[in-house]
Amino acid sequence: MLARREWMLLGLLLTAPMTAAVGNVITDWDEKAVAVVMPPTGPAGVTPVVYQAQRVMGMVHAAMFDAVNSIERRYRPYLVQLPADPATSQEAAAAAAAAGVLATIDQKTADEMKGALAAYLATIPEGKAKSDGVKLGEVVAAKIVEARANDGHDAPDAYRPRTTPGVYVPTAITAASMWPDVKPFAMTSPSQFRPNPPISLESTEWATDYNELKGYGGKTSIKRTAQQTETARFWLMAGPPAYHPFIRQLVTAKQMSVEDSAHFMTLVALGLNDALIAVFDAKYHYNFWRPITAIRNGDIDGNPATEREATWQPLDNTPMHPEYPCAHCILSGTVAGIATTVFGSADIPEIATTSTTAPGVTHRWTNMTAFAEEVANARIWAGFHYRFSTRVGTAMGQQIGDYMVKSVMQPARAAAAH
């Protein structure tokens, strides 16, 4: 828990005069990184792995933050704080750090990052400040990559379907069954925020949520409005493209300095990664059925108020992992929790973003609570999640967000001597 003096310092850091974030190196390289880990177009039939992409984003931002913070030293480091001249270029350090992490993905990306970094560095005046910044960023990137080398991200997916010998089960491979065993960036364990079990199938709440989803989440629903359908499709997008553009705009609107941008965006990037670990821990621990399974088996759940619909289908393809709790909800809850805790209010400047899954549609928000609520409703209207699961997911995310702000990269008690 932060002492009162530290919270006062954090408030001063966030309300002090800052450099406008237009063209900020942190937001620039966040955008580049998102395009690398989840390109807008890729080979036919290839689906980017959301959780792997978010892990890389966490590493990119941790490297940028520790590089910039080694120069300014206004926060405690995430992993490492290296000696650095105060005159060292923050822009060169952050760019080299981000490129250094991304270059480890594969040789093709390494070649692309070499060119991207050279182009970016060409905009920075030559001199010792620039060269020192590049060296600093490269060293920090290497240390972040080394620290995450054996975090379990590359473990094989060994999910074992529950079945009776000789009986067919759907043959598609589930997603992220190994992710509950990945080492978190900040949480003490994957199960640190594991929620209580799903509600009883015999309860009134189950019947209420079942029937809400059955009515509003079906592919041919006559209850769901055109606006609700649009919102459901808007939030079919997943991973870094769903949340990082929102955060970039928020940083810009708040006119954060380079270091405060690095701090805030690293909290979010690490928080989103740990939220995915936490939600997959809960999903595979409880192994709760998806609506398409529940509604087609509504006659065997022991609840007389849930009527079976033999041909029911969701609005879009159901994600290939257990239902409880809602993953999109824990991610939006994490973003909302971090922003609300850092800024001291859920109210924000108006932020507008588009979606890769709803071309031509723009959504706007002025409140983080409303942002998280929209995501929760979207997952119900898409036919993927029950109301109780969205509430639990959002609450988990808010807890993780609050934990991130109060547990990592806190304001330094005093400026370190250079």
For the regions a language model picked out, list residue spans one by one:
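Bacterial N-terminal signal peptides that target proteins for export
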Residues: 1-8
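Bacterial N-terminal signal peptides
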Residues: 8-17
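Acidic/polar surface patches and capping/hinge elements
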Residues: 21-418
